[in-house]
């Protein structure tokens, strides 16, 4: 058996040279200007394989749509966001008077801590009547840890925000489970699904989410198609117009699913 003396003299032979690994990117900050004139400032993680390092067009567009429809979508309502990243739609929902907002993303410590940081950044513009919570959540898991944030007597949400989540078509069944478990069975409850096909050749796969939703007790309505001024990634391949386009859908319980 080798002993410690056998390895004397190697020193730093197997030590990685300085600069061998690229330095970790520093966090950056971005701002979302609300229609009300208020500014939501968020920190973006320096880099992350789950894309928490960007403020996506779908997030901005969802936030603006929620603000425009605040009286019917969020005022006094309970809101859940999945795949929130920086959490702008959640924060805007709280600012516009939602009763409860639960902001979630994959239960990665960096993502969750960053969401908490962003919630605290906007605390001064959130009314005292609104409560904003942050949690890690893996799509398809039980929702009871999320509904635990709701006021006594409530066990589901009026609004489910799903911005740029349908890109992962393998996760479509789990996203359907989230809607089935978390969305209140009411004609007024709605899931807001907003996305941009950053890889346009995968758009048909993205869109398979909607017939799957219809097969599982929901009705789907396309509500907007907004072309942004410029693409998020200038050098990416694929149709440039599609990469600038944000698609918006509302998903509600089909009438035959309501009590």
From Swiss-Prot:
It is an enzyme of class 2 (transferase). Keywords: Cytoplasm, Methyltransferase, S-adenosyl-L-methionine, Transferase. It is found in: Cytoplasm. The lineage of its organism: Eukaryota, Fungi, Dikarya, Ascomycota, Pezizomycotina. One of its GO terms (molecular function) is N-terminal protein N-methyltransferase activity. One of its GO terms (biological process) is rDNA heterochromatin formation. Belongs to the class I-like SAM-binding methyltransferase superfamily. EFM7 family. The gene is efm7. Its EC number is 2.1.1.-. S-adenosyl-L-methionine-dependent protein methyltransferase that trimethylates the N-terminal glycine 'Gly-2' of elongation factor 1-alpha, before also catalyzing the mono- and dimethylation of 'Lys-3'. S-adenosyl-L-methionine binds at residues 56, 83-85, 105, 139, 163. PROSITE patterns: SAM_MT_NNT1. It comes from Aspergillus fumigatus (strain ATCC MYA-4609 / CBS 101355 / FGSC A1100 / Af293) (Neosartorya fumigata). GO terms for cellular component: cytoplasm. PANTHER family: HEPATOCELLULAR CARCINOMA-ASSOCIATED ANTIGEN (PTHR14614), PROTEIN N-TERMINAL AND LYSINE N-METHYLTRANSFERASE EFM7 (PTHR14614:SF10). This is Protein N-terminal and lysine N-methyltransferase efm7. It holds the Pfam family Methyltransf_16. Signal peptide: none annotated.
